């Protein structure tokens, strides 16, 4: 393993240590460094760092545009790589937060994301995605009916 490939591992370990010491802000900075050190999110550790950054935004109850973009990126990569973190409590809450934002926007983006996430192997996540997909489809059909 080359030194560059080890960076996400080191940042994740540092972030986890700082979090265990109650230093949440410093941990979040370490996770952000871990995410940036794995630009293409090729490593599990880089994806976990991004998940922890997304989770911090969800836990604060504030999702800005960049937070939504990061969360969607993480959801897509976690699904593509079949990361178990997507099925974790934090992962499902990130999923729900993003879908909630997309629901407020009208559902089109959410429906597209649901189609991608249907490929994830965990039954619980697929069921959650199916619920959101039905909501978006219903919302889209109602908005189509209203436009006529």
Give short role names for the model-derived ranges.
Residues 1-2, 32-36, 79-80, 119:
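Conserved structural position within tetratricopeptide repeats
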Residues 5, 39-41, 83-89, 122-123:
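Short coil turns that delineate tetratricopeptide repeat
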Residues 8, 44-51, 85-92, 127:
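Start-of-helix signal in alpha-solenoid helical-repeat scaffolds, especially tetratricopeptide repeats
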Residues 11, 47-55, 95, 114, ...:
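TPR repeat positional signature
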Residues 16, 52-60, 100, 135:
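Residue-level recognition of tetratricopeptide repeat
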Residues 21, 57-65, 104-105:
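Structural motif corresponding to the intra-repeat A-B loop/turn of tetratricopeptide repeats
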Residues 32, 73-76, 115:
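Alpha-solenoid helical repeat scaffolds
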